Amino acid sequence: MPRFFTRHAATLFFPMALILYDFAAYLSTDLIQPGIINVVRDFNADVSLAPAAVSLYLAGGMALQWLLGPLSDRIGRRPVLITGALIFTLACAATMFTTSMTQFLIARAIQGTSICFIATVGYVTVQEAFGQTKGIKLMAIITSIVLIAPIIGPLSGAALMHFMHWKVLFAIIAVMGFISFVGLLLAMPETVKRGAVPFSAKSVLRDFRNVFCNRLFLFGAATISLSYIPMMSWVAVSPVILIDAGSLTTSQFAWTQVPVFGAVIVANAIVARFVKDPTEPRFIWRAVPIQLVGLSLLIVGNLLSPHVWLWSVLGTSLYAFGIGLIFPTLFRFTLFSNKLPKGTVSASLNMVILMVMSVSVEIGRWLWFNGGRLPFHLLAVVAGVIVVFTLAGLLNRVRQHQAAELVEEQ
């Protein structure tokens, strides 16, 4: 058994531990959301504080991006990610002992830092530890599994709260976090030479400057962040569109989200199982028409035959399937088609994505309340069309980078 563990630690148990950590981080929001009103009432707090449980979690996710990437480039990936798993576990455990809404929200913000650790350090380690094609396929598998959480989380949370207190849910998540912590401690490989670059403010700023001056990174960051807009604006504003304006029940609304997340899961499963080379430009370009057809349905369907949810869900799901086919490849290209420190590149990319997502959600909300369904969906269409051009720029830069590497090898 020890020999089997040693042989498969990096290839099997490390990805499993990372998946569990990522899954637990998602569940810390998705599992508790159906009962967030109960949380507020338990603390005798104002109901208006309920959304803060999510917003502060996301704020925690943005707080340490600038630090963790450069830090992991210098002291190694292992100590940073393992520390993150421990912090998340302790924050979930601490939630069981909160006695006020303020304490609960502080714990939520600390739990949110898991986004920083996973996205900035964990995903980079996966890409570094495995080859290009295997790394992309493994990330597709991780995404497919983790995205089950937004589907089953709310339904499971609502069911479990009929039998147990909401604090017990955080105890369950804390146990999951602790198991992932132990798994990472035992199985995570180190992919960075420690101490190769000294940690100083000057060197960190220089690395960030070099990243944001790299045109390939800029094309990649623009492509990925704009690709998120159609899905994230829908996820954020759809409760208002479907429940408030469309008069759907919360249960009906939950089921309308399944096709969107399910489409991404299916797309990633196809990449992992059936696509021989997901970096092939012809495969990437074949996914683009699927995205554009989905975006077209958002406008054409609602113009010709308006429906409370059909065209919005169908169009967004089709788009999600198309972009899901190439998301892992886009991340790989953006992170590794340069000679820049990967932790800093990952941190920079995540900061751009989170900023664009935040702005796009606010724009989408404003368009819905001031213009209605069609102007709201037009935001997704505009973003999707721009992506075609930024994707062309990204692939052109990647091709130039690969050609330059071949010349250097010769």
Curated annotation (Swiss-Prot):
The gene is mdtM. Gene3D superfamilies: Multidrug resistance protein D (1.20.1720.10). Proton-dependent efflux pump. Confers resistance to a broad spectrum of chemically unrelated substrates. Overexpression confers resistance to acriflavine, chloramphenicol, norfloxacin, ethidium bromide and tetraphenylphosphonium bromide (TPP). Can also export a broad range of quaternary ammonium compounds (QACs) and contribute to the intrinsic resistance of E.coli to these antimicrobial compounds. In addition to its role in multidrug resistance, MdtM likely plays a physiological role in alkaline pH homeostasis and in resistance to bile salts. Disruption phenotype: Deletion mutant shows impaired growth in the presence of ethidium bromide and is clearly more susceptible to the effects of chloramphenicol. Growth of the deletion mutant is inhibited above pH 9.25. Deletion of the gene results in a strain that is twofold more susceptible to cholate and fourfold more susceptible to deoxycholate. Its main location: membrane. It comes from the Bacteria. Residues 33-48, 100-103, 162-167, 238-251, 304-307, 370-373 are periplasmic. It is found in: Cell inner membrane. InterPro entries: MFS (IPR011701), MFS_dom (IPR020846), MFS_trans_sf (IPR036259), Sugar_transporter_CS (IPR005829). Efflux is inhibited by the ionophore carbonyl cyanide 3-chlorophenylhydrazone (CCCP). GO terms for biological process: bile acid and bile salt transport; potassium ion export across plasma membrane; regulation of cellular pH; response to antibiotic; sodium ion export across plasma membrane; xenobiotic detoxification by transmembrane export across the plasma membrane. It is a multi-pass membrane protein. It comes from Escherichia coli (strain K12). Residues 1-11, 70-78, 125-140, 189-216, 273-282, 329-348, 395-410 are cytoplasmic. Keywords: Antibiotic resistance, Antiport, Cell inner membrane, Cell membrane, Ion transport, Membrane, Potassium, Potassium transport, Sodium, Sodium transport, Transmembrane, Transmembrane helix, Transport. This is Multidrug resistance protein MdtM. SUPFAM superfamilies: MFS general substrate transporter.
